[in-house]
C-alpha cells in the first residue's frame, strides 16, 4: 500500500473517532453515548488541601465539603439560608434570636447519623466550637466563633449560643459552610485528641453529608459513594469522581472528549469553543468571587497609599478585562457583591498613567538614569504572585509588568501552586509576599471585618493585606453590632469609601461563573456563593 492511501484511511478513522457520538436510547428518553448512568465525573483544577473545613483554604476543599458535611444551614443558589441539619433558621421574628440579639437557639433534626452510624446532633456542634477555639488547633479562621461566650447543650437536639455582643453575621459563621463557616465535626471520633492539626480525619473523614469518601488518589482523584445514613435519603447518584486536572487546556480537552461531565469555573478563553460542543450545556451566573491585586501594606515600598493608588491608575484594567479575560466578567470597585443590599456607590479608579506618575513624584520616588524609580536608595520594586493554572492569570501579570515599567516600577512575577500559596505557612498567611493576584470569595452577608480589620491580621485572621486603619477597624466591627440593615448599609458604605481611599487592593472583576456540563445532568443549579456543589443530593445523570 502506498503512503497516500494509508494516510487517507488513517484520516478517515480519526475523523470518525472525533465525531460526536449519537445519543443512546434509554427507556423512553435518550442519553448521550458517553454518559455513565449514576456516575458523575467532575474536573477540578485544584486538589483539596484538607478535608477538614477548619484547615481548608482552596475552592476544591469547599466543593468537597459540600459532599461530605451537612451544616446547620446551606446556602441556596440565591444566597438564602436553607435549613439542613437544623430544622429552622433562627430570627428575631421567630424567637430563635433573643430580643437583645445575644442569644441564639439552634434546633437539630432527630435521627441524623454519621456515616459510621454514630448519632449526629448538637453535641458535635458544641464540640466543634471548642475545637475552633482550642489554641492547639491551627485552624484557618476563628471569626464569629470567637464571639461566642458560651454554648449550652440543653438536650442533644437543642443548643443555646450566648454571644459576647451582637454579631449580625454570625449565623453564616456558626451554621453555614464556606468562609469561616465550619460544619460540625464528629465529637465521638475527635474529642479525645489534644490537637486536630495532624488528625487522620483531616484526610479521611467520615461523613454527615450526602456522600462518603471511598478513596483519595492523591494528585489524581477523590471518589465518593452515597452516605447510607444521610438524613434526606439516598442521593440520586451512585458515584462521584472528583478528578484533579490542574491544566485548563486539559480540562477543556476532557470535556470535549467526554471524559468528564462537569468542568466548573471555565477559563475565559475557552467559553466560545465550549458553546459549540454537542451534548454539553453551558451555565452562567454572577458569582461572589472577585479577583484583586492585593498589596502587602506592611512592605516599605507599598506602605504609602499614594504608591498603591499609582499602581491602580497605572494599569489598564479595563483593557485586560476586555482582552485577556475576554470580557466575560464584570468590573469591580469594591469587595461587596454588586447584587448585595450593602453594595456601595463606588466606581473603579480610572486608567490614568500621568496621574500615577504625579502620585509617585509626590511620594518621593524619583526616576533614575535607567528610567526606574527609587527613594532613599530603595528601588520601587515588588513581586506579584498568583496560581498559574489559568493562562490568563499569567498573561495579566505580564501586562501589569509591562505597564508598570513605563511608570518606573519593577514588577517581578513569582507564582506558586494553590496549595503552597494559601498554606498556613505559605507566603500569603506569613506575610512573605508583596502582592497577590488571586480570587477571593464572599458570603451572602457583607461582613468583611476579617478581611480588613487590624484585629484579624494573621495568625488570628485573614487580613493578609496587613492593613492597619482605625476607621476600617471600627466601622467594620460596628456594622456587626446591629441587625438593622439600614444602619449596617451606612456603616459599610463608610468603610468601603475608606478602603477605596487607602487602596489595600485593586478590585479587578466580579466573576461570571461559567460551567460546562453534560446535558444529561439533572438538578445542576449553580450558586452565587461558595460552591456549585451545594445541592449534590439532587443530582441525577
Residue spans for each PLM region:
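C-terminal motif of bacterial Sec signal peptides marking the signal peptidase cleavage site
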Residues: 15-17
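Detector for C-terminal structural segments
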Residues: 22, 217-221, 226, 291, ...
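Alpha-helical secondary-structure segments
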Residues: 41, 121-128, 156-162, 166, ...
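N-terminal lobe/hinge region of extracytoplasmic solute-binding protein
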Residues: 43-97, 130, 204-208
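Gly/Pro-rich hinge or "lid" segments in bacterial periplasmic/extracellular proteins
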Residues: 76-80, 177-235, 239, 249, ...
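Aromatic- and charge-enriched surface segment that lines or borders ligand/interaction sites
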Residues: 89-138, 160, 254, 301-303
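Surface-exposed binding/hinge segments that line
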Residues: 142-191
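Ligand-site clamp/hinge motif
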Residues: 199-202, 227-273, 396-402, 409-419
Amino acid at each position: 500500500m502506498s503512503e497516500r492511501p494509508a494516510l487517507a484511511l488513517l484520516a478517515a478513522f480519526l475523523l470518525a473517532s472525533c465525531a460526536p457520538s449519537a445519543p443512546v436510547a434509554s427507556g423512553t428518553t435518550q442519553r448521550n453515548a458517553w454518559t455513565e448512568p449514576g456516575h458523575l465525573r467532575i474536573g477540578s483544577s485544584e486538589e483539596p488541601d484538607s478535608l477538614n473545613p477548619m484547615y481548608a483554604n482552596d475552592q476544591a476543599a469547599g466543593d468537597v465539603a459540600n459532599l461530605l458535611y451537612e451544616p446547620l444551614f446551606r446556602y441556596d443558589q440565591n444566597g438564602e439560608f436553607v435549613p439542613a441539619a437544623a430544622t429552622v433558621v433562627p430570627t428575631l421574628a421567630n424567637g430563635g434570636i433573643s430580643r437583645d440579639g445575644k442569644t441564639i437557639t439552634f434546633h437539630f433534626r432527630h435521627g441524623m447519623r454519621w456515616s459510621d452510624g454514630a448519632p449526629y446532633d448538637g453535641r458535635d456542634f458544641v464540640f466543634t466550637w471548642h475545637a475552633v477555639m482550642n489554641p492547639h488547633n491551627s485552624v484557618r479562621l476563628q471569626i464569629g466563633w470567637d464571639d461566642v461566650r458560651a454554648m449550652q447543650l440543653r438536650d442533644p437536639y437543642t443548643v443555646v449560643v450566648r454571644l459576647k455582643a451582637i454579631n449580625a453575621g454570625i449565623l453564616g459563621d456558626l451554621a453555614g459552610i464556606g468562609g469561616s463557616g465550619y460544619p460540625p465535626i464528629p465529637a465521638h471520633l475527635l474529642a479525645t485528641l489534644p490537637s486536630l492539626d495532624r488528625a487522620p480525619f483531616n484526610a479521611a473523614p467520615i461523613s454527615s453529608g450526602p456522600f462518603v469518601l471511598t478513596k483519595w488518589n492523591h494528585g489524581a482523584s477523590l471518589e465518593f459513594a452515597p452516605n447510607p445514613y444521610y438524613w434526606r435519603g439516598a442521593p440520586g447518584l451512585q458515584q462521584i469522581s472528583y478528578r484533579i486536572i490542574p491544566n485548563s487546556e486539559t480540562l477543556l480537552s476532557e470535556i470535549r472528549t467526554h471524559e468528564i461531565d462537569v468542568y466548573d469555573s471555565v477559563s475565559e478563553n475557552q467559553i466560545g469553543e465550549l458553546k459549540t460542543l454537542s451534548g454539553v450545556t453551558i451555565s452562567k451566573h454572577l458569582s461572589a468571587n472577585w479577583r484583586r491585586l492585593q498589596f502587602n501594606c506592611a512592605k516599605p515600598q507599598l506602605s504609602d497609599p499614594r504608591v498603591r493608588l499609582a499602581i491602580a491608575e497605572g494599569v489598564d484594567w479595563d483593557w485586560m478585562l476586555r482582552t485577556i479575560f475576554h470580557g466575560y466578567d464584570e468590573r469591580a470597585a469594591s469587595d461587596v457583591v454588586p447584587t448585595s443590599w450593602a453594595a456601595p456607590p463606588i466606581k473603579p479608579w480610572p486608567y490614568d498613567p500621568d496621574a500615577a506618575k504625579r502620585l509617585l513624584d509626590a511620594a518621593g520616588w524619583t526616576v533614575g538614569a535607567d528610567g526606574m524609580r527609587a527613594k532613599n536608595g530603595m528601588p520601587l520594586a515588588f513581586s506579584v504572585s498568583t496560581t498559574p493554572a489559568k493562562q490568563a492569570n499569567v498573561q495579566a501579570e505580564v501586562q501589569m509588568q509591562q505597564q508598570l515599567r513605563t511608570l518606573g516600577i519593577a514588577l517581578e512575577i513569582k507564582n506558586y501552586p494553590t496549595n503552597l500559596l494559601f498554606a498556613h505557612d505559605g507566603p500569603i498567611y506569613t506575610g512573605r509576599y508583596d502582592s497577590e493576584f488571586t480570587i477571593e470569595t464572599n458570603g451572602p452577608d457583607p461582613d468583611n471585618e476579617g478581611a480588613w480589620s487590624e484585629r484579624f491580621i494573621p495568625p488570628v485572621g485573614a487580613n493578609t493585606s496587613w492593613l492597619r486603619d482605625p476607621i476600617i477597624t471600627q466601622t467594620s466591627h460596628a456594622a456587626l453590632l446591629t441587625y438593622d440593615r439600614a444602619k449596617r448599609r451606612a456603616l459599610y458604605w463608610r468603610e468601603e469609601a475608606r478602603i477605596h481611599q487607602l487602596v489595600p487592593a485593586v478590585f479587578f472583576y466580579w466573576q461570571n461563573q461559567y460551567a460546562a456540563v453534560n446535558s444529561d445532568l439533572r438538578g445542576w443549579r449553580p450558586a452565587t456563593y461558595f460552591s456549585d456543589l451545594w445541592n449534590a443530593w439532587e443530582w441525577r445523570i
